[in-house]
Each structure stands twice: as structure tokens, then as C-alpha cells.
């Protein structure tokens, strides 16, 4: 679903948009996905599931609040005690650098003069393929060397892969557009590989943290902690670009990764294995 969504909706959408216009391109993409959804809806049976007793928020609001939110939060504190602050801070800062840069990537490509087809092929088609490779690499490296050291190297790579964008911005003054496009392939390759690798490490980390008793609630809360604040902060990225330019913006995005590097180094050296067991 995700691969199809990126490769078809974005790659094909960009290519069609650059040739027949975005209104027709979006209509074609929507019709294809609608047709597939209807086909799957009627052809695939519902999986068997165990129906569990549900506590209604209206009939038992106090018990619902306790079971749904209070107990999962208290469980985290009971299991990690003094380390819970380190845990939450690491999750908060871990993807901040990458997510802060994300909203301004597409405006940057357009300002550099890349066409819709070039952006689609490099950032979406090639980028998604490299991300998948990064996912597998992350799984293999975590299995081979352990989680803590990969958390640290993931934080380092997340910050460092923002720096090539500084040089790509410098190439914007180059009169030869071939240099820009070639370096874009390299930048996207490094950045998307890191995203896949770091995504695997982050999912493994959070999966180790959550308790089997409160898996859904704790996982949702921790993922929320790691994504929503950075998304909100990312809303200021456009103002930073307008005020300081892309060069300083990419340096700021890199600097936002420093807290994650420090926190992950502490986790690595103290051998703090967050495990639900």
C-alpha cells in the first residue's frame, strides 16, 4: 500500500502533472485507487478476530480513563523509574532533525529548478527504493550489533545527511544543471537510506519499550511524542528560510540533531536496554 501510494500516486502523478496538468493527473490517480479499493473491499474476506469486552466511556468514564490512559502511563514510570525522562527525551528528539527539514524539501527542489519529472524519478521512485534498502539494512544491523549502538549511529546519520543539502544549495549558483541533478541523486540516496535505517531502529526501540499489556496505547503515545512536536516545529521552517535562506536552514536542521546524538550516546554507554520484559 505504501509503495504503491508513493510510486504510483507521486511518481506517476508528478509525471502526468507535468504533461497533462495536475487536475487531470489527480483525477486519474483517484480513479485508480478508488477502483482498487472497491475491488479489494468485495474480494477480500474479513479476518477472524477475538471480540473483547469493551468498557464504554459513557457508562464507566472513570474506569475507561484509567484503563485507557492512566494505567499505561503509570506502567511506563513503574518499569523505568528514573530513566523514564531519558526515554521520553530521546524519543522526542530522535527524528526532529529530519522531520524539521522535510516540509521544505519540495519547495527547495522547485527553487533549484528541477522539473516535476526529475523530482518524481529521483525523490520518489529512486528514493523509495533506497529507503526499502535502508529498512533491511537497519534490521540486519540491529540483529548483528544490538540496538543501543544503532540508536546512536542512527542519530548521527540523521543529522549528518542534512549537510549535503547545504552543498546542493551551493550548486544552485552553478551554471551547469547536470552537476545539480547528479548530486541530487547522491543526496537523496544518502538521505532516504538513512530514513529507512533510522525508521527501523526507531520502531525497534519503541517496540522494546512498550509493555505487552498496554501495547496499543503506549505505542501510540510514544509515536505521538516523536512526531507531533517535530511536525509543529516544522511549521516554522518556511519562516526560517525566508529570514535566513536555505543555507542556514539546513545548518539549523543539522544542529537540531545534536540533542538526539547526546542522548543516544548516554543510552549506548550506560547500556540502558529499554525492554518490556
Show where each model-derived region lies.
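C-terminal ends and interior cores of transmembrane alpha-helices
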Residues: 156-177
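Juxtamembrane intracellular "pre-TM" segments in multi-pass secondary transporters
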Residues: 48-86
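Loop-to-transmembrane helix entry/capping segments in MFS-fold secondary transporters
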Residues: 116-118, 212-222
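C-terminal membrane-cytosol helix-exit motif in multi-pass small-molecule transporters
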Residues: 31-52, 263-268
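Helix-loop-helix hairpin linking two adjacent transmembrane segments in secondary transporters
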Residues: 4-42
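Short amphipathic helix-loop junctions that connect adjacent transmembrane helices
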Residues: 103-120
Amino acid at each position: 500500500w505504501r509503495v504503491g501510494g508513493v510510486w504510483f500516486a507521486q511518481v506517476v502523478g508528478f509525471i502526468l502533472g507535468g504533461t497533462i496538468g495536475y487536475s487531470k493527473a489527480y483525477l486519474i490517480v483517484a480513479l485508480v485507487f478508488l477502483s482498487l479499493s472497491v475491488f479489494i473491499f468485495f474480494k477480500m474476506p474479513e479476518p477472524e478476530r477475538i471480540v473483547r469486552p469493551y468498557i464504554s466511556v459513557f457508562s464507566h468514564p472513570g474506569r475507561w480513563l484509567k484503563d485507557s490512559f492512566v494505567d499505561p502511563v503509570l506502567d511506563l514510570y513503574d518499569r523505568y523509574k528514573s530513566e523514564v525522562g531519558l526515554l521520553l527525551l530521546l524519543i522526542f528528539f530522535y527524528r526532529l532533525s529530519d522531520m524539521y527539514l522535510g516540509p521544505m524539501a519540495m519547495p527547495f527542489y522547485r527553487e533549484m529548478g528541477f522539473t516535476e519529472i526529475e523530482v518524481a524519478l529521483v525523490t520518489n521512485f529512486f528514493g523509495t527504493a533506497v529507503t526499502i534498502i535502508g529498512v533491511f539494512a537497519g534490521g540486519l544491523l540491529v540483529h548483528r550489533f544490538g540496538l543501543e549502538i544503532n540508536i546512536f549511529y542512527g542519530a548521527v546519520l540523521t543529522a549528518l545527511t542534512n549537510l549535503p543539502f547545504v552543498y546542493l544549495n551551493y550548486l544552485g549558483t552553478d551554471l551547469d544543471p547536470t552537476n545539480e541533478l547528479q548530486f541530487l541523486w547522491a543526496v537523496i540516496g544518502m538521505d532516504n537510506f538513512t530514513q529507512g535505517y533510522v525508521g527501523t531502529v526507531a520502531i525497534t526501540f519503541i517496540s522494546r519499550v512498550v509493555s505487552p499489556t498496554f501495547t496499543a496505547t503506549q505505542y501510540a503515545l510514544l509515536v505521538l511524542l516523536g512526531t507531533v512536536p517535530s511536525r509543529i516545529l516544522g511549521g516554522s521552517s518556511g519562516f526560517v528560510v525566508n529570514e535566513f535562506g536555505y543555507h542556514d536552514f539546513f545548518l539549523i536542521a543539522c544542529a537540531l540533531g545534536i540533542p538526539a546524538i547526546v542522548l543516544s550516546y548516554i543510552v549506548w554507554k550506560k547500556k540502558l536496554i529499554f525492554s518490556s520484559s
